[in-house]
Amino acid sequence: VVITTKCSMNCESCANLMQYYKSQKNTDSEILKSVKLISDNVDHISEYRIIGGEPLMNKNWAEITKGVIDQDPNRSVYIYSNATICPKDEQLEMFKGKNLHFYLTDYGDLSRNMEKTMKTLDKHGIGFYRKPAGNWVDCSGIKKHNRSVKKLRQVFKECCATELYTLISGKLYTCPFIANAANLKAIPDNKADY
């Protein structure tokens, strides 16, 4: 679930294309309505991932996350963060006893609040997983590749994100790259993509 296109970093070749967003924005207004629509029409969703950009750049990240959890308290919710921003105590208090976890990608010195974030999450009993930013995958660039149908199928089959659906701007995409390329209007709108 993309809750913002704002990011505290500007990574070249970002898999979610955040470097291409000129007017970055939060996408609060329809998120919970879209999540409810999906939840009402899918038998079981074991996990939601709250992403961005950097999700903590959305000042309403805690309320949105709580809204996702409240729709089904048994599902796990993971917030993917680069630990440049430490969540505030008052934001984390509402997650006591909730099935919330943080996935912290460690970019070394760029993740300037990593230690503070881990201490704060520990203090509130919120689980987290810290992983170094290794194995960087250059998903592609926004350009016409002129691939054959056979080659397109092969690229999709080899993609590391084929089982990660992306909810952005009220649409559920089967590919995070396509989701952001479409949201940027860098490619034509194609209903087959969502």
Kindly give the residue locations of the regions a language model identified:
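Conserved alpha-helical substructure of the radical SAM core
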Residues: 1-79, 86
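Short, positively charged
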Residues: 27, 136-150
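Acidic (Asp/Glu)-rich catalytic clusters
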Residues: 38-42, 91-98
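Active-site beta-loop-alpha junctions enriched in small/polar residues
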Residues: 53-55, 82-84, 105-107, 133-135
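A short acidic, amphipathic alpha-helical/loop segment
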Residues: 60-67, 89-94, 115-120
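Non-cysteine beta-strand/loop elements that form the S-adenosyl-L-methionine
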Residues: 99-110, 129-133
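Basic phosphate/pyrophosphate-binding loop/patch that engages nucleotide-derived ligands
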Residues: 113-129
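Accessory C-terminal segments flanking Radical SAM cores
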Residues: 144-194
